[in-house]
Amino acid sequence: MAVYTDIAEDDLKWFLSEYDAGSLLSYKGIAEGVENSNFLLHTSKEPLILTLYEKRVEKTDLPFFLGLMQHLAARGLSCPLPLPRRDGALLGSLSGRPAALISFLEGMWLRKPEAKHCREVGRALAQMHVAGDGFELKRPNALSIDGWRTLWEKSEARADEVEPGLQHEIRGELDFLSAAWPKGLPAGVIHADLFPDNVFFLGDQLSGLIDFYFACNDLLAYDVSICLNAWCFEKDGAYNITKGTAMLEGYQSVRPLSGEEIAALPVLSRGSALRFFLTRLYDWLTTPEGAMVTKKDPLEYLRKLRFHRQIGSAAEYGLSL
């Protein structure tokens, strides 16, 4: 979450009047994340999250995101719910941006997740994949294999400013993945951004998943690879196989991976590492100074990508074959 667009208190009060949400008591911006402008509101009824959708988010995608949250919650997944306006619409407008009010989810994200937490995340991810079955709206993944080269071209000219030799290395990686990317694996709705700051815990109990604004239709095992990258590496860059084992066992306790998915996991993990490297690289080079946003180091994901190149089998991630 982040803040790119400021809001005036009078405008916010007018916006709230379109909802049965009580009167405004206080509000503050939330700096974490990189996509939308987010605020924590306290009203006379309940705490809420206000999201202003910035230019990177297509307005035509919003019915998918908001409808998916409703669909998943109706099937028992703990996730935020969009609040309807008095006229029944889920979307309004504030400060020249599409805007929505979302229910507040209790919990905090973990700064130092342990293996037991990774197991819970794996289980919750599989539950989301199962619950997403039957959701009728579709959204292709613009940040998967077909979109990476276009994204790379936006940063390629300056890439060697971040690390010498990057241009050559990433061109080669794109060529490899274009040839090796698996086809025909089980697909469905994926979260596509299930990082620690998008999973809330109360103590050791997972209390919910948040931030569905990258959700889309893609390979389910690709979502698993995103979580391996996001949860199972230590701050020194080392892969923690104990966490990986817990993550994969948790996932398979709900939805067992097929043999084809298991065989593809090293390539999928290279791809998901490249995806986050590319978006971080672009943001690193283009985010304006002074924006109330946390920029993330692209080289973290370059190191993960290099790790995955050395992997020969999913057993090296901790998966029992």
Swiss-Prot record:
Gene Ontology molecular function terms on file: ATP binding; homoserine kinase activity
One Gene Ontology term from the biological process aspect of the record: threonine biosynthetic process
Pathway entry: Amino-acid biosynthesis; L-threonine biosynthesis; L-threonine from L-aspartate: step 4/5
Keyword field contains Lipid metabolism: no
EC number(s) per entry: 2.7.1.39
Similarity comment text for this entry: Belongs to the pseudomonas-type ThrB family.
Protein name, per record: Homoserine kinase
Taxonomic lineage: Bacteria, Pseudomonadati, Pseudomonadota, Alphaproteobacteria, Hyphomicrobiales
